[in-house]
A protein has these predicted regions:
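Short linear loop/turn motifs
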Residues: 40-44, 115, 207-210, 253-257, ...
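N-terminal alpha-helical segment
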Residues: 19, 37-40, 174, 222, ...
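Residues that form generic nucleotide/phosphate-binding pockets
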Residues: 26, 47, 64, 158, ...
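Long, C-terminal-biased catalytic regions of enzyme "large/alpha" subunits
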Residues: 1-85, 92
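Compact, charge-rich alpha-helical regulatory domains located at protein termini
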Residues: 216-278
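Short leucine-rich amphipathic alpha-helices used at interfaces
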Residues: 2, 7-9, 13-16, 207-208, ...
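Intrinsically disordered, low-complexity Ser/Thr/Pro/Gly-rich regulatory segments
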Residues: 34, 61, 65-224, 241-242
Length: 278
C-alpha cells in the first residue's frame, strides 16, 4: 500500500484518512480470529485506492469473511441487517421490544397514552416490577444518517408531558425512564444535550454509549435479525417481517414459518444450520 495517506469516502459523503485500526476493530468485534483478521486487512490494504468508499471496503471484507468464517460474516453485517428491517420502521420497534423481553421486561408496541396536554403514540412500552420505560425507536434505513438535536429535543418534550401521569402497566405507576433508541449514530450536539437529562432521556445509539450501546445489547442477547441470513432471499425476508417475525431464533422455534414460505426441506435445513452457527 502507498505510504501516502489514503482518503476514503464515508456513507455521508465526507472524506477521511483510512484507519487500519478501525477495520481491525470491526472484524475482531464481530468475532474474527486474529489470523483471519490479519489476512483480510492485508488483502484490503493492498488493493486500497484513494476515494474508495466505506461501502466498498465493507463489501470486500464481508465477502472474505463469508468464505473464511461464515458465522462471523453474519455478525459483521449486523448494522446493515438492522437497516434492512425497514423501510417502515415498524419491524425495528418489534426488534427493540425483543431486546427488552430478553432483559426480563413485558412489552407492548404502538401504544397511545395520555400526557398532561396531549396523547402520544409510544413505539415501545416496557415494564417489570421495578420500572416503567417508554421508548421512541428512531429507525434510519440509510447509512450516514444521524439522529440530531432536534430529534432529542422533540422526544424529551414528549416524555416531559408524560412524566407526571399515572399509567397501568403491570400496576398503577408513573414513568421511570424515557429512552431514545436509534440504529445509527447521534450528532455530537444531541449527545451533549442528552448527557444532562438523566433518566428523562436515556439515549441508545448503534455505538453509544461506550458500554451498553444497541450493538452491545444485540450481541449480549444474541438476538440476530433474520435479515442477516444469506439463505433467505429478500422476498422471503419481507414476508416474514410483514408477519411480525424479526428474529432468527424464532425461525428455529417455529419451523412452520419456513414451511409456510414454500421452502423445500433442503433449504429449511440450510437456514436452520446458518442460524445455529450464529
Amino acid at each position: 500500500m502507498n505510504t501516502e495517506p489514503i482518503y476514503i469516502v464515508k456513507s455521508d459523503g465526507t472524506r477521511e484518512i483510512f484507519d487500519i485500526k478501525k477495520l481491525e476493530f470491526s472484524l475482531k468485534r464481530a468475532g474474527a480470529s486474529s489470523a483471519v483478521t490479519d489476512g483480510i486487512v492485508s488483502t484490503i490494504t493492498d488493493s486500497l485506492t484513494d476515494g474508495m468508499t466505506t461501502h466498498d471496503i465493507y463489501t470486500r471484507a464481508f465477502e472474505l469473511l463469508h468464505t473464511d468464517e461464515h458465522p462471523v460474516a453474519l455478525k459483521y453485517s449486523l448494522k446493515r441487517a438492522i437497516m434492512e428491517l425497514g423501510p417502515s420502521g415498524f419491524p425495528f420497534e418489534d426488534y427493540v421490544a425483543e431486546i427488552f423481553k430478553y432483559k426480563g421486561f413485558e412489552t407492548l408496541t404502538g401504544q397511545v397514552v395520555k400526557g398532561k396536554f396531549v396523547e402520544h403514540e409510544i413505539d415501545v412500552v416496557a415494564w417489570n416490577d421495578e420500572k416503567l420505560i417508554m421508548v421512541e425507536a428512531k429507525f434510519h434505513n440509510q447509512l450516514g444518517v444521524k439522529s440530531d438535536l432536534k430529534i432529542a429535543l422533540y422526544v424529551k418534550e414528549r416524555f416531559d408531558d408524560l412524566s407526571e401521569q399515572t399509567f397501568h402497566y403491570g400496576k398503577d405507576r408513573k414513568l421511570d425512564e424515557g429512552w431514545l433508541v436509534t440504529n445509527t449514530k447521534f450528532t455530537t450536539t444531541a449527545i451533549e444535550y442528552g448527557s444532562h437529562q438523566g433518566k428523562r432521556l436515556v439515549m441508545i445509539g448503534w455505538n453509544y454509549p461506550e458500554h451498553g450501546s444497541l450493538h452491545d445489547m444485540i450481541l449480549e442477547a444474541k438476538l440476530h435479525p433474520l435479515t442477516c441470513l444469506t439463505t433467505l432471499d429478500g422476498r422471503q425476508k419481507k414476508t416474514l417481517l410483514e408477519q411480525g417475525i424479526v428474529l432468527c431464533k424464532t425461525l428455529v422455534e417455529r419451523p412452520e414459518l419456513l414451511v409456510g414460505l414454500g421452502l423445500p426441506s433442503e433449504t429449511i435445513a440450510k437456514v436452520t444450520e446458518e442460524i445455529q452457527a450464529l
